[in-house]
């Protein structure tokens, strides 16, 4: 039976083998990461294991989905067996051996392929994260065992489903099952309207998110609404559209349109679910591909934005919240405002190690974890407003850093935000400030704690005294003085010297410079960046392969199913006078009408979601929307080419079936 149905079973077995190989490779790579004891292995292991468990979930769904196509094609065959004298228990026995053989072939081929490629994939992971590696052949038997166990469970449920679906039907129903769906579906206006409403609501959620926190909270509800809307519109909306086309006599009463439209109306109920699935999976591929490529390609820019100099020191100055006069009165140089002990320690350490500091950046910063509501920010706990990270800078630092020449009166402020809608006058913990001007662009990546999934707002105030007053006001609202806010002094600088001298400076800085709460050395942080974003790209590749496999399989089986359904119908059309050329043109037109609709909808989905995705990417320190846009467009083009290739191959198979 499997040989006779090779056109159906071969792609199924290939997909099962590919997914078994993916599971084995992911499992074995996670084992190799642990055994290697490499630096940053915890992050890589966690991401690979998360990817492994998510892949298990999708493998179950994909196998059940494709198995349903196969069973639909074979139910008529099983009905014939029953009429010829086979009992249900005999059919169950046949199904058992077919499922067992499928599982055995898939495991043998998948694990064998996984063993061959697992070490190469491990080296690819090391390449992505910037670590050296060498090719060593090994087989983690733990990975073999877990892959076998997963497939045993999965195929057990597939077998139970197949046996139940066959045993519940009588022979007549089995013979008739492959023809199900030929009755013209009714126009379900309510479902079409509900789908349009759900899709519209999902789009509105995506387009009205102004901050990273809103984007994270709205993302999954928006995804659910878009999925519901997509399925409803493909199933109910498409039928309504086709029937509207049928009423257009000028369009409908042409041979190619007549056959295509009438044929699609009769089968759209079963066809629409597959098209909607293709659309959702295509969107998943585009989102995953564009996001992973953007994060990986932009990791060096993100590193330099977040850590603008080689040495980045954050010094906490609690006394400034008590006494604004602790700053010296000299205003001639930038260094006059730097706490003397920190500045002296940097100079002393530079001299003792033989290094020179250069390209320094120095500025005060006050950070307040606040709630926002109606132009008011407060640090009080239990406030019902939206979460916001509030940064305060003084005007002198802002003008110096950005080459500006703003002037502010007392009670005025410049304002920048990633989404918080503040207009007119702002209330910060009881202190009133009039917004003199909104800043359109601000490099928030240089601020301590910027990579948070909440709204980010920056107030530039006239002087340090304003920052001290705001720090006191914010702390006064915090009960029991828990987690008080302090003013920080950021000291960023590059360092020049021999390799040994620079290493000595970096090693001694944390212990010899007073007041340091955090110190980041860019060359050391770079390894952590590469480990994180390289691992994200690695697991993204597996998700892309998985989603592409599911997409191609659904397309392939949809074309085969439609081909068999259309074969008799087009045979009749040839008998009543249509030429082979007209039949082929009609087939091509029909396939084009439905084939590229999911791709078009997927492009619309990702275009609408792009602003929300940009906000979500800031959680990963990705603030370069232009780079993300470039990779999104590139992903659409690459996927479009792959989609076109699949179309050409499956259209050829479809035509062969119809013409046979």
Question: Which residue ranges define each predicted feature?
Answer:
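Aromatic- and glycine-rich beta-strand/loop motifs that create alpha-glucan
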Residues: 1-7
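Hydrophobic alpha-helical transmembrane segments of multi-pass inner-membrane transport and secretion
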Residues: 7-34, 43-79, 100-113, 227, ...
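Alpha-helical transmembrane segments, especially those used as permease/efflux helices
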Residues: 10-16, 21-25, 149-154, 183-300, ...
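Basic-flanked hydrophobic alpha-helices used for secretion and membrane insertion
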Residues: 302-549
């Amino acid at each position: 039976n499997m040989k006779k149905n090779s056109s159906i079973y071969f792609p199924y077995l290939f997909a099962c083998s590919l997914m078994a190989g993916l599971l084995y490779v992911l499992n074995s790579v996670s084992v190799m990461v642990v055994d290697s004891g490499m630096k940053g292995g915890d992050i890589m292991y966690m991401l690979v294991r998360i990817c492994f468990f998510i892949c298990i979930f999708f493998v179950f769904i994909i196998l059940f989905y494709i198995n349903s196509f196969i069973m639909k094609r074979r139910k008529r065959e099983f009905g014939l067996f029953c009429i010829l004298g086979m009992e249900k228990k005999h059919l169950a026995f046949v199904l058992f051996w077919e499922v067992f053989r499928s599982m055995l072939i898939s495991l043998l081929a998948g694990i064998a392929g996984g063993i061959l490629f697992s070490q190469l994939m491990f080296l690819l992971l090391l390449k992505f994260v910037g670590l050296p590696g060498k090719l060593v052949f090994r087989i983690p038997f733990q990975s073999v065992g877990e892959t076998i166990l997963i497939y045993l469970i999965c195929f057990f449920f597939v077998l139970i489903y197949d046996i139940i679906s066959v045993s519940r039907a009588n022979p007549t129903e089995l013979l008739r099952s492959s023809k199900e769906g030929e009755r013209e579906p009714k126009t379900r206006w309510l479902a079409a309207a509900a789908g349009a409403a759900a899709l519209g609501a999902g789009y509105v959620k995506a387009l009205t998110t102004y901050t990273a926190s809103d984007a994270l909270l709205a993302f999954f509800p928006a995804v659910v609404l878009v999925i519901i809307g997509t399925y409803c519109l493909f199933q109910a909306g498409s039928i309504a559209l086709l029937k509207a086309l049928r009423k257009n006599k000028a369009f409908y009463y042409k041979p190619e349109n007549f056959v295509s439209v009438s044929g699609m109306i009769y089968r759209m109920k079963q066809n629409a679910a597959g098209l909607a699935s293709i659309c959702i999976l295509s969107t998943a591929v585009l989102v995953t591909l564009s996001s992973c490529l953007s994060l990986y390609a932009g990791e060096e820019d993100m590193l330099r934005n977040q850590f603008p100099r080689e040495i980045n020191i954050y010094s906490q100055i609690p006394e400034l919240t008590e006494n604004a006069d602790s700053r010296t009165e000299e205003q001639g140089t930038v260094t006059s405002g730097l706490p003397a002990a920190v500045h002296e320690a940097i100079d002393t350490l530079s001299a003792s190690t033989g290094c020179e500091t250069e390209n320094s950046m120095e500025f005060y910063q006050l950070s307040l974890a606040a709630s926002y509501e109606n132009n008011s920010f407060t640090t009080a706990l239990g406030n019902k407003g939206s979460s916001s990270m509030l940064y305060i800078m003084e005007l002198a630092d802002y003008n110096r850093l950005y080459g500006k020449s703003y002037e502010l009166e007392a009670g005025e402020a410049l304002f920048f935000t990633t989404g918080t809608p503040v207009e007119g006058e702002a209330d910060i913990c009881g202190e009133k400030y009039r917004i003199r001007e909104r800043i359109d662009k601000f490099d928030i990546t240089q601020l301590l704690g910027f990579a948070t999934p909440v709204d980010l707002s920056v107030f530039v105030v006239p002087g340090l005294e304003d920052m001290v007053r705001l720090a006191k006001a914010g702390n006064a609202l915090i009960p029991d003085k828990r987690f008080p806010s302090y003013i920080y002094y950021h000291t960023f600088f590059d360092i020049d010297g021999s390799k040994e001298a620079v290493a000595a400076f970096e090693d001694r800085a944390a212990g010899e410079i007073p007041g340091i709460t955090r110190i980041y050395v860019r060359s050391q942080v770079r390894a952590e960046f590469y480990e994180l974003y390289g691992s994200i790209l690695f697991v993204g590749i597996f998700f892309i392969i998985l989603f592409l496999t599911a997409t191609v399989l659904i397309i392939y089986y949809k074309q085969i199913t439609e081909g068999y359904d259309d074969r008799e119908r087009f045979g009749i059309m040839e008998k009543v006078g249509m030429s082979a050329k007209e039949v082929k043109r009609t087939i091509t037109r029909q396939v084009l009408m439905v084939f590229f609709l999911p791709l078009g909808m997927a492009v619309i989905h990702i275009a609408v979601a792009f602003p929300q995705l940009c906000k979500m990417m800031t959680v990963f320190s990705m603030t370069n929307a232009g780079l993300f846009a470039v990779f999104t467009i590139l992903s659409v083009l690459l996927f479009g080419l792959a989609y076109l290739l699949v179309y050409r191959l499956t259209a050829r198979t479809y035509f062969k079936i119809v013409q046979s």
